């Protein structure tokens, strides 16, 4: 049962002052309690965030908040194709190496993001028209990037945003040239590159159990798994509008029915960042056994891609919002 807002606020105040006494100065931590630690106490793997060299070296409060309050990191941009292989066969890992070193040094679980995506894709890839060429390019890219961090990345978003809103495959260079077989190629290559990593298919607008897009995801994943494609998890980005948190339970349960080992909330942000919405999403993951964790897509509002909607858990002064304390109280 989800506590009402009055209960959440009261409990949050009690825990805030208790946390100050037990966890050191709030100023150094930026929040009195780690929601990651409390989430893990319920048997989940992580409650995490994102980072890259630019944000880590910007406001010093960002790394302080990550170190103290979150247990997992995804790279916002540094592992995308345009960053790692801007020219064919010429790999650049400066940004992603920095990210991985920070995460490992601070004991954070790493999710790799992302290997095959139609966006932030160099033109030399998007202009390919030959099946053999594109297959070889995909295999080389996936293998090289994954082996760079073999044994260091818990899970990879192997393919990202491959569905249209009607549940059909998105038109992209990958689907145009290879059809849906690009999914098999990507996952089989990823499994070979790092057999221990969990392999995810990730998408947005999977926020209603009855939507055509979610149903398309489920039916395709069931089919691919039955055909032997090694898909371990489904990632729901969960970029929500205000008031949409209540649907998270139904959507995660529906995604879990596809037959993967895991599901995860991979890019969470919510317009207005209400306590109710955030607690609804946290409870949805707690209640679904296959949901291993939640990644919030940004630390503080100024760094959000949706900054004008104030969607994150820390405000413009990098102080925790009511939603952060409500999550801590609910846990």
From Swiss-Prot:
Catalytic residue list: 161 (proton donor), 267 (nucleophile)
| Any single Gene Ontology cellular-component annotation | extracellular region
Which InterPro entries does the record cross-reference, listed alphabetically?
A: GH10 (IPR044846), GH10_AS (IPR031158), GH10_dom (IPR001000), Glycoside_hydrolase_SF (IPR017853)
Q: Name one GO molecular function term.
A: endo-1,4-beta-xylanase activity
User: Is Signal found in the keyword set?
Assistant: yes
pH-related activity info reads: Optimum pH is 5.0-6.0.
Please list which residues make up the signal peptide.
Answer: 1-23
Reaction catalyzed: Endohydrolysis of (1->4)-beta-D-xylosidic linkages in xylans
Instruction: Tell me, in a sentence or two, what this protein's role is.
Output: Endo-1,4-beta-xylanase involved in the hydrolysis of xylan, a major structural heterogeneous polysaccharide found in plant biomass representing the second most abundant polysaccharide in the biosphere, after cellulose.
Q: Which family does it belong to?
A: Belongs to the glycosyl hydrolase 10 (cellulase F) family.
Protein name, as recorded: Endo-1,4-beta-xylanase 1
Organism of origin = Rhizopus oryzae
């Amino acid at each position: 049962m989800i506590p009402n807002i009055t209960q959440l606020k009261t409990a949050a105040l009690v825990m805030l002052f208790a946390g100050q006494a037990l966890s050191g100065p709030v100023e150094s931590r930026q929040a009195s309690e780690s929601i990651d630690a409390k989430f893990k106490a319920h048997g989940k793997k992580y409650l995490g965030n994102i980072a890259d060299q630019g944000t880590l070296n910007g406001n010093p409060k960002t790394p302080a908040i990550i170190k103290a309050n979150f247990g997992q990191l995804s790279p916002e941009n540094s592992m995308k194709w345009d960053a790692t292989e801007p020219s064919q066969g010429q790999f650049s890992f400066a940004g992603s190496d920095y990210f991985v070193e920070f995460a490992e040094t601070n004991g954070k679980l790493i999710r790799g993001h992302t290997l095959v995506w139609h966006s932030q894709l160099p033109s030399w890839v998007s202009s390919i028209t030959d099946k053999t060429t594109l297959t070889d390019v995909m295999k080389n890219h996936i293998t090289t990037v994954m082996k760079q961090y073999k044994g260091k990345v818990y899970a990879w978003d192997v393919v990202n945003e491959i569905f249209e809103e009607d549940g059909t495959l998105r038109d992209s260079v990958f689907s145009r040239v290879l059809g849906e077989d690009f999914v098999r190629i990507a996952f089989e290559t990823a499994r070979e590159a790092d057999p221990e990593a969990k392999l995810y298919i990730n998408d947005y607008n999977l926020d209603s159990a009855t939507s055509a897009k979610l149903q398309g995801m489920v039916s395709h994943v069931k089919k691919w798994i039955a055909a032997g494609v090694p898909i371990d998890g489904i990632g729901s980005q969960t970029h929500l509008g205000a008031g949409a948190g209540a649907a998270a339970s139904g959507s995660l349960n529906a995604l879990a029915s596809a037959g993967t080992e895991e599901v995860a909330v991979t890019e969470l942000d919510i317009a207005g960042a209400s306590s109710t919405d955030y607690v609804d999403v946290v409870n949805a993951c707690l209640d679904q056994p296959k949901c291993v964790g939640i990644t919030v897509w940004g630390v503080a509002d100024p760094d959000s891609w949706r900054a004008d909607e104030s969607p994150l858990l820390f405000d413009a002064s990098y102080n925790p919002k009511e939603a952060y304390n409500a999550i801590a109280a609910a846990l």
